[in-house]
Amino acid sequence: MNTNIDPNKLDLEERVVTVNRVAKVVKGGRRFRFAALVVVGDKNGHVGFGTGKAQEVPEAIKKAVDDAKKNLISVPIVGTTIPHEIHGQFGSGNVLMKPAAEGTGVISGGPVRAILELAGVGDILTKSLGSNTPINMIRATLNGLTNLKTAEDVAKLRGKSVEELLG
């Protein structure tokens, strides 16, 4: 993840994706804790996710938000969509993301929608392939978003100008 993004300079919004009650079985019975999965973003090209565990739900969410702020990435956005089609993968979670025409909206489910909306993507088509576990879907989506390249990046890699590349 990109570490040079300062979360204090961004106006971050947070969204809780899941809160899960987990149990540790001990001799005297079960010990319950809560695991939270949170996505944060500024709706302007910066997004991150984090996890937190604690005895109480609010404390787990707070830990997850702090973790998410440490894992911010920058997402290239062209207009209201992404620059090109991309396939993100993590474990058995696969997410296919395609740019969409303006006015389409975010066509996506669950955790992927939370990431894309908080990243500031307004029009996109997505399809979840494989595992639908929230953590795997989030990591697969972030993997895809980190691999996005703008036309300027591709032109620089090829040693050409953007005009030569596009036309």
UniProtKB/Swiss-Prot annotation:
<dbReference type="InterPro" id="IPR013810">
    <property type="entry name" value="Ribosomal_uS5_N"/>
</dbReference>
<dbReference type="InterPro" id="IPR005324">
    <property type="entry name" value="Ribosomal_uS5_C"/>
</dbReference>
<keyword id="KW-0694">RNA-binding</keyword>
<dbReference type="Pfam" id="PF00333">
    <property type="entry name" value="Ribosomal_S5"/>
</dbReference>
<dbReference type="Pfam" id="PF03719">
    <property type="entry name" value="Ribosomal_S5_C"/>
</dbReference>
<comment type="function">
    <text>Located at the back of the 30S subunit body where it stabilizes the conformation of the head with respect to the body.</text>
</comment>
<comment type="similarity">
    <text>Belongs to the universal ribosomal protein uS5 family.</text>
</comment>
<dbReference type="InterPro" id="IPR005712">
    <property type="entry name" value="Ribosomal_uS5_bac-type"/>
</dbReference>
<dbReference type="GO" id="GO:0015935">
    <property type="term" value="C:small ribosomal subunit"/>
</dbReference>
<dbReference type="InterPro" id="IPR000851">
    <property type="entry name" value="Ribosomal_uS5"/>
</dbReference>
<keyword id="KW-0687">Ribonucleoprotein</keyword>
<protein>
    <recommendedName>
        <fullName>Small ribosomal subunit protein uS5</fullName>
    </recommendedName>
</protein>
<dbReference type="GO" id="GO:0003735">
    <property type="term" value="F:structural constituent of ribosome"/>
</dbReference>
<dbReference type="InterPro" id="IPR014721">
    <property type="entry name" value="Ribsml_uS5_D2-typ_fold_subgr"/>
</dbReference>
<dbReference type="InterPro" id="IPR018192">
    <property type="entry name" value="Ribosomal_uS5_N_CS"/>
</dbReference>
<dbReference type="GO" id="GO:0006412">
    <property type="term" value="P:translation"/>
</dbReference>
<feature type="domain" description="S5 DRBM">
    <location>
        <begin position="12"/>
        <end position="75"/>
    </location>
</feature>
<dbReference type="InterPro" id="IPR020568">
    <property type="entry name" value="Ribosomal_Su5_D2-typ_SF"/>
</dbReference>
<dbReference type="GO" id="GO:0019843">
    <property type="term" value="F:rRNA binding"/>
</dbReference>
<keyword id="KW-0689">Ribosomal protein</keyword>
<comment type="function">
    <text>With S4 and S12 plays an important role in translational accuracy.</text>
</comment>
<comment type="subunit">
    <text>Part of the 30S ribosomal subunit. Contacts proteins S4 and S8.</text>
</comment>
<keyword id="KW-0699">rRNA-binding</keyword>
